[in-house]
Amino acid sequence: MTSTILASSQQTRFHIANSTMSSLSGTSSSSKDLDIPDVSISISNSDASDKKKGSKGSVAENEKEILADAHLKLSSGVHYALVGRNGVGKSTLLRAIGEKLIPGIPLDIRIVSMQQSYDNPEIKSAKDQMSQGEDVSVLDFVISSDQERTEALRRQKDLQVALDNTQDPTAAVRILRQFKFDDEMRVLDEAKKAANLRSGARGMAARKELKIIETRVEEKRVGLEIIDTQTLAEETNEAMMMLSDIEGFLEQMSPSAVESRAKLILRGLGFKLKSPPTVTQSLSSLSGGWRMRALLASVLFQPSDILLLDEPTNFLDLPSLLWLETYLQNDLPANTIVLFVSHDRAFTDSVAEEVLVLRDLKLERFPGNLTAYEETRSERQRYLTKMAEAQSKQRAHIQDTIAGNVRQAKSSGDDKKLRQAASRQKKLDDRMGYEVGSRGGKFKLNRDLPGYHLTSRAGIEGMIPKDEAGVKMMLPREPGEELRFPGPLISVEGLRFVYRQRGAGTVTVKEALSGVDLVVHPKSKLGIVGLNGAGKSTLVRCLVNQFSEGGGKIVSGSVKYHPAARIGFFSQDAIEKLPLDKTALQLMMASLGDDPGSASSQHEARSVLASVGLTSFTVSSVPIAKLSGGQKVRLALAQVLYPPPKLGPVPHVLVLDEVTTHLDADTVVVLAEELRKFKGAVVIVSHDRWFVRKVVELDGGEDGSAEGDEGDEDDVGAEPGVVYEVEKGRLVELKGGIADFEKKIRSRKAG
């Protein structure tokens, strides 16, 4: 069963933007803004791939709605952060925009996207080349990602070879006709897409245009090999002119300048240009994380009108992340639209100029970054709540006054007063509501509430921003078993760890860790930061005593464990190890003992999953393959907290390696609060500066949480933890915490 994205908009039934026709005619639309009303998007799990979205507002049972009559507006040159809970469809929306599935997106607009997946089309293309024996280097992969330039180079080569072919004078003509045929096929594909998106009179006109193009394509197909000697010289001259135009286009981008720009981007993302260079390594030799960096480099390298980035910071260390911040802020063309999703709050606040909030099937737009949005929303919520309460008291007072007047009128038989009371009641019902105009001044009905309404004022209660249901996550407060005697949980002393790399008859020893000392006490909160490749993951593997085959060994020093200590380990590849064909409930029930299928076992498994926010239909009917990245992280975290064979007991120490990857901002906030309340030890390896500050340093910075959070009570008397940096195989305590590390990185980049 495959998933299909179904998209519609107002453009479907009424009109397609003029830019769509301009792309078919070969011209380019001047504006690159997107302003599309009534956008509806859903995901269908039906096998019928040619199924179209039904009538407005109708959704089939096998469809999941992402947007319903939402307004999609992206302005030229603005950087947008797309935020929303895990599973609401942020990645689906980016894909729908990137693949131009939404009617009204101009076909000639250049959209470049990075998806949150190893199965990205660009990576797949590179893999196809590898399977055919055409392995590509990282640098070549990035340079060749500019498809317009790559196609121009291919045509230049083919035309030059054909024109130099003295044995076959018709070679250049055949190549010219093939190029024209390829261009017509692209126009045909666009015409089919435009015809499918239209209806009514415009749809009929589009289908007539499609018939004309199909006829033209068929004529060119037939004429590919039929060469008229009378037009041979004319078409050969046309081929020479095409070659001249292509060479003029390529002269504007010299090979040296192109390579320099590609190297600049790769270097910023952590690739080495020398000693030894990693930009010349084959793409197939890279790990998954470094392949995603190469993909990000290729996306940044390509010219674009709209740049879509889905979790671009997931595989970046702090230097690369800071470089990406600067690049997006300062080095993109001024009119480029950027729409990105990121769980890193510091990165989001730094890059975003506006926020798009995907909530309740709508897109809410806010001018400012994420922190400003949360502050403004909270302030408006408090302001309108107070206004509603005050007006409620005023309404009650007026209602009492009217009731008193009615009683007096009835007792005295004064019909005039009775009519007066009825008039006041009518005014109360019609005009009591929001009294502030759209410009902040006095309310004016025609300007501020146009159209037909049941009353002359909007109700205040309906204007108060509604809070989403809180992120559901309640981790255990303490380890499952009390230690019978005191002592450190993990003690590392003088640790030296090496890798042995075998070459052609030689063995190279690479030192990963040297002289490392570390003690994890029962209530320690420790943060470990450092550059990629510095040895963080190696240190973590030593702490949890998990090594891959041929993954090196400890040659001196020691790692000692409390004999009764239980260690829970969340690895970077935890979600990749999940069985995709099972449901979350099936996975957790398989961890139970003698009778995993019993009702009591199912209840226990559901309780465990509910503690990390996975409930109902999601755990029982949705295969793990269909879960969002954040939901998979929650499931993997549940396995760490409640290990088999009996779903427990809870470990004494949690070692979490990049656990915030794929989590939305709200979930990261709640996870940080829950880890602060955990009475066991926590060791965090993370590039998320905010997360380390919150959990380890007990920082109470901006997080969007409500005032007076109950988690503050758990911090009373608690001492901040310690942040360490792994640098060139050594472990160094950072006295100033994560701020010291960030300061060091920025000064190093400036130098």
Language-model features and meaning:
Residues 382-426, 435, 439-451, 742-751:
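ABC ATPase nucleotide-binding domains
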Residues 438-478:
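Amphipathic heptad-repeat alpha-helical coiled-coil/stalk segments that mediate oligomerization
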Residues 423-430, 451-457, 536:
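Eukaryote-specific, cytoplasm-facing alpha-helical/coiled-coil scaffolding segments in long proteins
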Residues 7-9, 424-427, 432, 460-462:
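Interdomain "pre-motor" coupling segment immediately N-terminal to P-loop NTPase/helicase cores
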Residues 138-145, 153-158, 165-168, 411, ...:
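Internal hydrophobic scaffold segments of catalytic domains
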